Amino acid sequence: MAKFIMVVGTSSNSGKTVLVSGICRMLSNKGYKVAPFKSQNMSLNSRVSIEDGEIAVAQYTQAMAARSEPSVHFNPILLKPKGNFVSQVIVHGIPYEDRDYNEYRSKKDDFLDKIKQSINYLDKNYDYVVIEGAGSCCEINLLKDDIANLRVAEIAGADAILVSDIDRGGVFASIYGTVQLLPENWRNLLKGFVINKFRGNIDVLKDGFEKIEELTKIPVIGTILYDETLILPEEDSQALEGKRVFGNVKSPIEVNIVKFSKIANFTDVDPLSSDCLMKYIDFNDDITGDILILPGTRCSTVEMDLMKKHGLDKKILEFVENGGIVLGICGGYQTLGKMLIDEDFSEGDIGTISGLGLFDMETTFGNEKAIKNSTGTISIFDQNFNVTGYELHEGHSVSNETPLISLSRGFGNCGDSYDGSFKIIGNSYIFGTYFHGILENFEFRNYLVNFVRHKKNLSKIENDNYAEIFNENMDKLSKLVEESLDLSKIIK
């Protein structure tokens, strides 16, 4: 039987996701078989599990931290917002149906049964299960229908830790208010408080620790210092609010990423950030980079319509005329074609719309969703690159261009043996693919960066290995968590 631990928060962005990752890596380093778990997550950022099912990217990342194969049981319910208060409901990795909040709530007991199935599976197959809550664990207007927080701890028999972000201010009031508003049976599950993102001398907090422990009879088990050197994947698009420039600010290579209105899987671009200056651009902005990335999106037709309305489509075509490099990923790839055909309005209110026309390609929506871990070979250069990625798309594309990838596993453009498209227009190279994670492939990423460096008469570089950087930072996070928290009463 597994030991269950739960991390809940006083608010969204309190540090639950990162703390779970750190605990998972810490336990893995001690030789335990560890699983992360989040009963219900709402996110447009998702990845593909070992079973070819869809789970939130946060639980995938936590699985990597735990050194465990990512499973649909790590995130049994995934909600992907579609707009107008409707979300696509993913159950155990498979699209279930679209529901608004009231429709979803009416089936709460059915979804809770699925959550219990996953808890039972994890209990039998792991030594430790580290559960992440959602948002605030005490939204009193939602408590009776909350299947993502302390109800889950109660079902699993988990000891719970309450984390709060001191960087926002009001940390002790947030902790005390949360505890007081919780029903007694859930309050009794709390075994300790964690203060997150503290800057300065911890001694100034001692009076606060003593008072909050006196009032609640629950100890503060640690304070995590704010560490700006940690490089960790972001969980969802909220992290992009106000984010404009990141990556290697001293790099002579600039990458522009179109900040789509319904951007998804934006972490696809992260592997470039160690060697390139990364900059998000809005629909009204000029393109100033050497490489332009059109990322994934929940609604390709909506993004295409917005690009036309704001004139970004013309700027992209001008960028190509001037020899720029373009990479479209999933929804971004679809916009590079001639037509996006959505006769059933499955993508939204736009329907059928013409694309950028850089590829001789048509994409049709309304088909069954492709959810695959995929592999293949890129053979368009003077050498072959073996690549891996994952597919999450409902549109099927028929392209008359040179395929980017010859598939050995996957769905690709339309269920044939190929994925993506490649085209040279003058001095411009245009790449398109359904492979999320394409830039995690070292050889392809290295070729792309050095191709730009060659065009700018710069010497070649060997990129950092993205997987190595991830593991180095997870080990650093694990050490920070272990040194900051007293988990002796929870981890036995």
From Swiss-Prot:
Pathway: Cofactor biosynthesis; adenosylcobalamin biosynthesis. Pfam families: CbiA, GATase_3. CDD domains: CobQ_N, GATase1_CobQ. Residues 252-444 form the GATase cobBQ-type domain. GO terms for molecular function: ABC-type vitamin B12 transporter activity; catalytic activity. InterPro entries: Class_I_gatase-like, CobQ/CobB/MinD/ParA_Nub-bd_dom, CobQ_GATase1, CobQ_N, CobQ_synth, GATase_3, P-loop_NTPase. It comes from the Archaea. Keywords: Cobalamin biosynthesis, Glutamine amidotransferase. One of its GO terms (biological process) is cobalamin biosynthetic process. The active site is at C330 (nucleophile), H436. Catalyzes amidations at positions B, D, E, and G on adenosylcobyrinic A,C-diamide. NH(2) groups are provided by glutamine, and one molecule of ATP is hydrogenolyzed for each amidation. PANTHER family: COBYRIC ACID SYNTHASE, DETHIOBIOTIN SYNTHETASE. Belongs to the CobB/CobQ family. CobQ subfamily. This is Probable cobyric acid synthase. It comes from Methanococcus maripaludis (strain C5 / ATCC BAA-1333). The lineage of its organism: Archaea, Methanobacteriati, Methanobacteriota, Methanomada group, Methanococci.
